[in-house]
């Protein structure tokens, strides 16, 4: 393990976080809030520590995949610890455990909250909560690689370790250029949503924070009722953008380039949109009597399906009161998640496709034992390593899920609450059902259960392995 280079990169991460943390200070100045001093203190602390480490140049350039995974995992933990400090210092969230839970939930774009009264927070704290979604949505290392000329051949290791999905590719030969393209698309889409929300009558502060949550598919709201208080036009705009941010960003790159036709041929996007359409249709029919007309039922069904499958977590209504069939459909799409290469969480549609095709292949062998069938994605054969990786991910995911469920069950809450709490955190969704539903919160859990759920949030956002490697002794051996 090359500790010096990991420490050097962590220095850059803290420096970048300090720059981000100065923005809530500006918000505090605008609203004349004394809570902004907490952000200023922590921002200066991050900057001082970061600059001290950056100044110490590292000579060794040895950097393998394991260094990439460990660096990313440690970066997200350290970012969350420092990101939680302003909440504790300004007393918006006095408990460090609760503040850390809220911050990890923000950076991992989960949106699970321990707060019962969100509106009691200062504007600068509300802004930071939502801004952590935007930072975490695309990933801090994508941002880092886009603006800094990091050298040494380890850029791709960092990007692969942080990016959501079975694999991450390069749109162009250089990793740094790929990072720039990703962030350019991300920023433009965020700005377009802000403008549309403003034009629909949403106040500027609300437009900014809601757009940050939508872009990062996070779901922290600034109102206790989430998105329910806004008009249907605003809700419809958010619905559309949640779906757009759940699409593989490769599709947008293809649309901007000379391969526009290929963008519409992406198999994962077809499955993603088909699943959304099917889920919306089922829930619309199932809830039409609740909402008294088909259009209103469709409106809420579209919003909640978009919110859940993209793992955003916003809500326009208390879907925990919906019929059992509708609730079951939402739980299913919680697991499926968005597309790989998007800002969404969950298992990912691409993995679901590979799992389904693997099962189909195995069934085919029972009928025709001597047949040779190749699993394809976008008409391209998948390697045995890719298929094995998906299967290993699914097994690891299941083991973490079961272990987490068993541990938090010691708090003695009902099974639906516990099951959906793990589902909501491991898939980075936010709200679950029952006590952790749209009108509930995660403050009910004990400190031990909260730390387990924090682990789940980090594991889910980083695709399991970076966090798990931290607990592997052999990883920490020096080269």
Region locations from a protein language model:
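Membrane-proximal intracellular helices of multi-pass ion channels
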Residues: 1-479
